[in-house]
Curated annotation (Swiss-Prot):
Its cofactor is Mg(2+); Mn(2+). The lineage of its organism: Bacteria, Pseudomonadati, Pseudomonadota, Gammaproteobacteria, Alteromonadales. Pathway: Cell wall biogenesis; peptidoglycan biosynthesis. Mg(2+) 2 binds at residues 297, 299. It is found in: Cytoplasm. Its main location: cytoplasm. This is D-alanine--D-alanine ligase. Keywords: ATP-binding, Cell shape, Cell wall biogenesis/degradation, Cytoplasm, Ligase, Magnesium, Manganese, Metal-binding, Nucleotide-binding, Peptidoglycan synthesis. The keyword Membrane does not apply. It comes from the Bacteria. Its EC number is 6.3.2.4. Residues 124-330 form the ATP-grasp domain. One of its GO terms (cellular component) is cytosol. Cell wall formation.
Length: 336
């Protein structure tokens, strides 16, 4: 069998561009263990330009090939692509639509599932439709006096709130608000990141994560892992990725009753199947002191940085990441 020409596409136009590059390192290292693929790593910059790791300017054409600006270099045909892009245009579903248009097989969730999960408002509507408990919320579609009044009413009712840009990841455009005098400014900032904003009740709870992925025809949900932050903070962008972060992670959360763990995993699989996710996801939950389970969010292309939970949970579940990737890629190309 001839080797598969695999395009590892990373970067993108969001605030998570640099995190995407770190995740791509993990994919590149894992793929290097396989003798079945030729890997070409290409960075998509914030202006939509492509460049190889060697610094060659290039583009992905509608003929499913990488064409170089230096015309002395032969085009590189692409059999398969891994869009290792956090945020826009990867997790938003935009780039998947393009792959569908040019009939290029790709790793990860399809366009509609990606879009539905990335938009926090759409996602919560899906959670409720599937009968999966989630945090109380309101959503806003413009910054005006009415939006400020609605948010202040929510704060008065709930005591503490999170104001979030509806279409951002990694806690970008996310603010915890306890003081009504801060509402107007925070709303203005959030609307600077997205055209829609969601306001959620602050939940005092443990933050649990489940890796959910397809393996040999089955949907697998790992035991919940846990993000442990300082009690007075939340899991901000810096807490996730900065070297000075004080947050820590447990690949398997401690002191979670077996029946609660089973219910979390059941909800995770229900969300994965109900929202028609594909290949991989990380599904995040809150667990309150009263053992109430609330689905927080779904990440359709979870990070694979040195501190990321998804690859650790997959490995802890007994699966090798390189073998997992190979099974997905070969299965997808065989069904083409």
């Amino acid at each position: 069998m001839s080797k598969i020409n695999l395009l590892l596409l990373c970067g993108g136009g969001s605030a998570e561009h640099d995190i995407s590059l770190l995740s791509a390192n993990y994919f590149e290292t894992s793929l290097a263990k396989s003798e079945q693929v030729n890997v070409l790593r290409v960075v998509l910059d914030k202006f939509g330009q492509y460049q190889t790791a060697a610094g060659d300017d290039c583009e992905l054409t509608n003929n499913r090939e990488i064409r170089f600006r230096d015309e002395t270099k032969a085009p590189w045909p692409v059999d398969y692509v891994i869009p290792c892009i956090h945020g826009y245009p990867g997790e938003t579903g935009d780039i998947q639509s393009y792959f569908n248009l040019i009939q290029l097989p790709y790793f990860g969730c399809e366009s509609e599932a990606s879009s539905n999960c990335f938009n926090k408002i759409t996602a919560k509507m899906w959670f409720s439709a599937l009968g999966i408990p989630n945090t109380p919320y309101i959503f806003l579609n413009q910054y005006d006096d009415e939006a400020i009044a609605q948010t202040q009413a929510a704060l008065e009712n709930w005591g503490s709130i999170f104001v979030k840009a509806a279409s951002q990841g990694s806690s970008v455009g996310c603010y915890k608000v306890d003081d009504s005098s801060k509402v107007a400014g925070v709303l203005k900032d959030a609307f600077g990141y997205a055209p829609y904003v969601i306001v959620e009740k602050t939940i005092k709870a443990r933050e649990l994560e489940v890796a959910v992925y397809e393996y040999q025809g089955e949907v697998v949900a790992t035991l919940p892992g846990e993000i442990i932050c300082d009690s007075n903070t939340f899991y901000t962008f810096d807490e996730k990725y900065a070297k000075s972060s004080k947050a820590r992670t447990d690949v398997v959360a401690q002191n979670v009753p077996a029946d609660i763990s089973d219910q979390i995993r059941a909800y995770a699989i229900k969300a994965f199947k109900g929202m028609k996710l594909r290949h991989l996801s990380r599904i995040d939950f809150f667990l309150t002191q009263d053992n109430e389970i609330l689905l927080n969010e779904i990440n359709t292309f979870p990070g694979s940085t040195p501190i990321s939970m998804f690859p650790k949970m997959l490995q802890n579940h007994g699966h090798d990441f390189t073998e997992y990737l190979s099974l997905v890629i070969k299965g997808q190309l065989a069904a083409k």
